[in-house]
C-alpha cells in the first residue's frame, strides 16, 4: 500500500506560509504554491494514481486569492481527499492583527487583498473571514506572532517531520502577561506554585537553569501539579489517537513565562519522551 502524505498549507498573509512551504521543500517534499482550490482534487487524484509504490510527500499552498465560492467548498474537497484514502492534513498559520500590520509596514509589501484605499486592517479582517472554513478544518494551527523566521522553520520541522503514524505532542511554556496561546489544545495554570522570581538570586535565571530547577524540585506542590497534568494527558492521549488526531499542543503558563512554566514544560516533555509520540518543547517567552 502506498504511503502518501499530503499537507495543505494555508493561513493569513504575513504569517509565514511561504516559510513553512520552503522549509518542507528543503526537507524533500514536493511543493506547489498558490494552487487554485478548484485544482486540488485533480492534483490529489494525480498523486494517488502516479505516486511511486514507496509513496511520497506533497505540500500545497492555498491562500485567500481563490474565489469565495471555492473557499466555501473546502470542507467537501477535504472529505473527497479522505475518500481517496490519502493521508491529508491542513496546516494553518496565523498571527495577531497587530503583528501582521507591523510586518507589512516593515517590509512595505502590499497585502494581496488590498484594493485601492482599503485599510490594511480591513484587508486582514476580510482575509480572516474568507479563510475561516479552511481554518475550521485545520489539523494543526500555528500562532507565529512571537516567532521569527528561524524559529518558524524549526517549529515546522518539529511538528511536521515525523512518522504520520505517530502523534506530535508539543509542550509549550508561556507567560499570562503576554496572553494565552490561541493554538493550544490544553492550557494549565502554574501561577499557583511558589515563584522563583521573588528569590533575588533566581530572578535573572530561567526554568532551564539548575538553581531554579533545584528550587522548584524542593516544593511538594510542584511535583504534585506536574504529576496530575501528566496523568490527565496520559489518560486522554489514546482518545486523540483513536480520533486520528495528529497534533496536540499542551500549554503551561505562569506570570512571565520564565521560571515555573518553563520547568514544568521540560519535565512533562521528559516524562513522555520514552513513549511512541513525537515530543517537542517550545518556550514562547524565552524566544522574545
UniProtKB/Swiss-Prot annotation:
SUPFAM superfamilies: P-loop containing nucleoside triphosphate hydrolases (SSF52540). It comes from the Bacteria. One of its GO terms (molecular function) is ATP binding. Pfam families: PapZ_C, RapZ-like_N. ATP binds at residues 11-18. Keywords: ATP-binding, GTP-binding, Nucleotide-binding. GTP binds at residues 63-66. Displays ATPase and GTPase activities. Belongs to the RapZ-like family. PANTHER family: RNASE ADAPTER PROTEIN RAPZ (PTHR30448:SF0). NCBIfam families: PRK05416.1. This is Nucleotide-binding protein Mlg_2233. The lineage of its organism: Bacteria, Pseudomonadati, Pseudomonadota, Gammaproteobacteria, Chromatiales.
Amino acid at each position: 500500500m502506498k504511503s502518501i502524505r499530503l499537507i495543505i498549507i494555508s493561513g493569513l498573509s504575513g504569517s509565514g506560509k511561504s516559510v513553512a512551504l520552503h522549509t518542507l521543500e528543503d526537507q524533500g517534499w514536493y511543493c506547489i504554491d498558490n494552487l487554485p482550490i478548484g485544482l486540488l482534487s485533480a492534483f490529489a487524484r494525480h498523486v494517488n494514481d502516479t505516486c511511486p509504490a514507496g509513496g511520497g510527500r506533497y505540500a500545497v499552498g492555498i491562500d485567500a486569492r481563490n474565489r469565495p465560492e471555492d473557499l466555501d467548498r473546502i470542507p467537501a474537497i477535504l472529505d473527497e481527499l479522505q475518500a481517496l484514502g490519502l493521508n491529508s492534513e491542513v496546516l494553518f498559520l496565523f498571527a495577531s492583527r497587530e503583528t501582521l500590520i507591523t510586518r507589512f509596514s516593515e517590509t512595505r509589501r502590499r497585502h494581496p487583498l488590498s484594493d485601492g484605499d482599503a485599510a490594511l486592517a480591513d484587508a486582514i479582517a476580510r482575509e480572516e473571514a474568507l479563510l475561516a472554513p479552511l481554518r475550521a478544518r485545520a489539523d494543526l494551527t500555528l500562532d507565529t506572532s512571537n516567532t521569527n523566521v528561524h524559529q518558524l522553520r524549526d517549529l515546522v520541522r518539529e511538528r511536521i517531520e515525523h512518522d504520520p503514524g505517530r502523534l506530535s505532542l508539543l509542550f509549550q511554556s508561556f507567560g499570562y502577561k503576554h496572553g494565552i496561546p490561541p493554538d493550544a489544545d490544553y492550557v494549565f495554570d502554574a501561577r499557583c506554585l511558589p515563584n522563583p522570581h521573588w528569590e533575588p538570586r533566581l530572578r535573572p535565571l530561567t526554568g532551564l537553569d539548575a538553581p531554579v530547577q533545584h528550587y522548584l524540585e524542593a516544593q511538594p506542590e510542584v511535583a504534585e501539579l506536574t504529576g496530575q497534568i501528566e496523568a490527565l494527558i496520559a489518560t486522554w492521549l489514546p482518545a486523540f489517537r483513536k480520533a486520528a488526531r495528529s497534533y496536540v499542543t499542551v500549554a503551561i503558563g505562569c506570570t512571565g513565562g520564565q521560571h515555573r512554566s518553563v520547568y514544568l514544560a521540560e519535565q512533562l516533555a521528559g516524562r513522555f519522551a520514552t513513549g511512541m509520540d513525537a515530543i517537542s518543547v517550545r518556550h514562547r517567552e524565552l524566544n522574545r
